[in-house]
């Protein structure tokens, strides 16, 4: 079993993901509660001439909002340390209160939502992140440093920590031993007794600790939180960016509140057409493709620390750890399960790839500290943020009704080993984690967004968290989806692909909708 490790500089910046499948009226509206261009480091050519769309609502200067912002510049920089953000950025924070609205107590209870504001623009632009990535406030702070200046001259980014994450009444209910067992588990072991036991205990402890909160952590109620924030900001329509699984919150919002949708960018949307097994299988395929891109990138840099065959180096490391876990300085161990979860996490952020290659090589040489640090935020959290696994489990299991028996999961592991030799077992095992959790009464509705303005979707070809086909199928299902395909790698295109970022800039700032579809090369 691996003891929580101390985070390195690397782990703070990594988008860590466990293999869990998981203009109407003149005033602020009430809630309804009960194309080919060069991208990356190559200078981008102009995308295909976009079409001016009168269907996109104008940007709003908000009426007087009800949010009292206070300076949080120092604490934000401390939370992101050792990441250095430009001194020109300043950060303000606030809290707003939304209804908890548990299924067992509709309309009752409260949840406090943590917000962060960065940018000097008059129009608020809400930012919603993955459950298993940085809290939305910190993701917005990092995103502000990656976007062209025009974004922050037009908008103030408003990062929102989703209920149960970051500073929004964070969930911290999974016993440490269970958390470690889930992350450490041997991805080749089809005897799932230990993993099932940890999942069962985790679900029981969270249900006891959270009580009525447990069932109130889901996408639909988070969409209600978005409308609460919209009202508090003083706008009739909310402009927003959803990253990864955070995109699903915005499609749910578009279905529930189409008249309050402004300009929305969904960067890496989950596939709404797949069940849990289909999602895990798509992720396994995408993770394999992303690792291939990572290996090619390593070799293209010269003197790749993983040698001429990075996949073989990783396989050798995993085989070694399967029988001889590496001791860590804090008394813990690096197992093959922890190592593979760490690699999956590191693949998500392309800027971390050089450090990931070095970490794998050092682990292969007997020093696993840097590789273990990639899963630190999942297992141990940080001094200011709880472990991410807890909210990811609770919310993820509330969003899907599929529950697989251990025998089904073991059979799936065997079936996927040939097609997905690195990540098939790990992603198949993830299908067991929701088994002990209560099944939600209603499935998550398929997104339609009927009556909403055009919604821009950014797809990344090799995305190990939300595979590119998810954005493509979401665009097909939405009444007004417009797709930009980036043929690159990593989790999300915004701020990573110059082409996709430019398309989003034209859409958000100028109100121009790109050709559908538009393709951006790597």
Locations of regions flagged by a protein language model:
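Structural motif
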Residues: 326-340, 347-352, 382-390
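Flexible "cap/lid" loop of the alpha/beta hydrolase fold
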Residues: 270-288, 358-361, 368-382
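N-terminal export and membrane-targeting signals
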Residues: 1-17, 238-239
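Bacterial signal peptide processing site
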Residues: 27-30
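Short helix-capping/linker segments at secondary-structure and domain boundaries
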Residues: 347-361, 402-407
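C-terminal motif of bacterial Sec signal peptides marking the signal peptidase cleavage site
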Residues: 21-25
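Long, low-complexity segments enriched in small/aliphatic residues
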Residues: 369-400, 404-405
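Gly/Pro-rich cap/lid or specificity-loop segments adjacent to the active site
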Residues: 49-338, 394, 400-522
